[in-house]
Amino acid sequence: MKVVFVSSEIYPFAKTGGLADITGALPRKIASQGVKVFGFMPLYKTVDINKHGIIKIDASVDVNLNNRVYTFEVYKKIDDATFFFLKNDELFGRDYLYGPPEGDYPDNDIRFGSFCYAVMEFIKRENLNPDLIHVNDWQTALIPVLNYHKYNNHHVRTVITIHNLAYQGIFDKFAIERLNLGWDLFHMEALEYYDKVNFLKGGIVFSSAITTVSPTYAKEITFPEYGYGLDGVLRKYSNKLYGILNGIDYDVWNPETDKYIYENYCVFTIQKKSINKKLFLKEVGLKDEAKPLYIFIGRLAHQKGVDLIRDSIEEMSKMPANFAILGTGDKGYNDFFKSIEGKYENIFIKVDYNEAFSRKMYAAADFLLMPSLFEPCGLNQMIAMRYGTLVVARDTGGLKDTVKDVSQPDGYGILFKNPIKDEFLNALYRAVELYNNKKLFESLQKKVMEIDFSINNTAKKYIKLYESLKYSREVKI
C-alpha cells in the first residue's frame, strides 16, 4: 500500500505545537509496519536543511493561481519514510509558519492553497500513484477537494484528520477565484460558510473519511459546544467520522534514555525520580522537596484553561505544594505571568518554551496540570505518565480517554468536570491528599508508567482504516 501523508508541520523539521509531534511520529510508525509512505511539508525559512540532511533534488512544480505562477523547488529526505519539502521563498521564506504573534498572514489562503496544488501536481508528475492521501487540519484540507474535483482521482481515497476544530482556515469568498476553485464549489454543500470560504469544511465534505485524535473528541465535535460552527456538517457526515487516539513515540519519550533529565530511571528504578525532583527544585529556586510538585507545560491560551490558573494563583501560593509553570502564548497571559515571576516563593514561572527544560519538569514532577476547556487529544498527559507523573485534568476530550479518576476502580489520576475555580482548586487539594498517601501514590506512579500510550497503537488503527478504505470494506478500528 502507498500513502501520501501531508501536514503543514512535521517534527523535527518544523513545529508550533502538538500537530508536529503526531505528524512526525505517525508516518514513520506506519512506514515501519510495511506501508510505503511519502510525507509532504512546506520548506519554511526556519527549517535547518543541513541539520536534518534535507537535499535538493532535480525537480520543481509550477502552480498557476491568481494570475501568477508560483514555482516550488523540491527537497527530499529519506529515513523511515520518504519526506518531500516544497520550497517557495515568497510564500514560505518567512519568520513564522502561519503568522506573527499579532495574527495570521493575510495571504495564508494563497500560501497553503498553492501548497496543496503543488502536492497534487508533484504526485501526478512523478507518478506516485498512492492508494490514499492523508491530510491534517485546515492547511492541507483543500487536497481532498482538489483530488475529487480538479484531478478526478476518485479511486484515490482521502483521509482528513482534525487535530483542533477551532482552526478552520476561513477566508473571504473571493478566495474561490484566487485559488481557481470555481464558483460551482461556493455553496452550502461544499466550501461556502456564512458567505466565506472554509478550507476545513471542504476537507470534511470531500474526504473519504474524517478522523479526530480521540474517541471522545469525535463525539464532542458533533455538538454545538465543541463544534465551532461545523457541528451540523459533522453530524451530517458522522457515518465517516472516527476517533483514533493519538499516541507518543516511546523512543523519543523515555525516562530511561532521556539525555536531558538529571537522572535516568524506569519503572523498576522509580526511586531515582526523586533525584530529578530535588535537583530541579534547586535549579529553579523552590524549597522543600517533601511538598508535592505540580507543573503546567503548554500554550498560555484560553483553550488550555490558563484562566483557572491565573484566577487561582493566590490560593495556590498558600497551598502546601510547589508549582512550576512553563509556556508562552497569548500576549495577555504572557504579560500576566511575567508580572508575577518571583512574587511567590512556591511558584516558579518561565514564560518561554524549551523542550529540554520541559523534560526536566516531567521527570521531576508529582502532578501535571491540564485544566483545558477542551482538549482534542493532548499528548502532555501521556508524556507525564510515561515519566511517572500523575495527571490533574479536566474531564474532556482526549483527557477523558486517557485519565481515569482515582475514585474509580483502577483509577490513576484526578479529574474535575466543570471549568470553574472551585472545582479546579478542589482537584488540587485532592491531589495533595493522594500525595500524602505515600503507599498509594507510589503504586500509581508505577501504574501510569506501564500504561501503553505508544504511537504504535495509533499506527495500527490507521492502517486498518486505510485498508478498509482501499478495499471498500466496512471500517472496523
Swiss-Prot record:
Gene: glgA
Family annotation (HAMAP family): Glycogen_synth
Species of origin: Sulfurihydrogenibium sp. (strain YO3AOP1)
GO biological process, one term: glycogen biosynthetic process
Family: Belongs to the glycosyltransferase 1 family. Bacterial/plant glycogen synthase subfamily.
Protein EC: 2.4.1.21
Enzyme class: transferase
Keywords: Glycogen biosynthesis, Glycosyltransferase, Transferase
Name the record gives this protein: Glycogen synthase
Lineage: Bacteria, Pseudomonadati, Aquificota, Aquificia, Aquificales
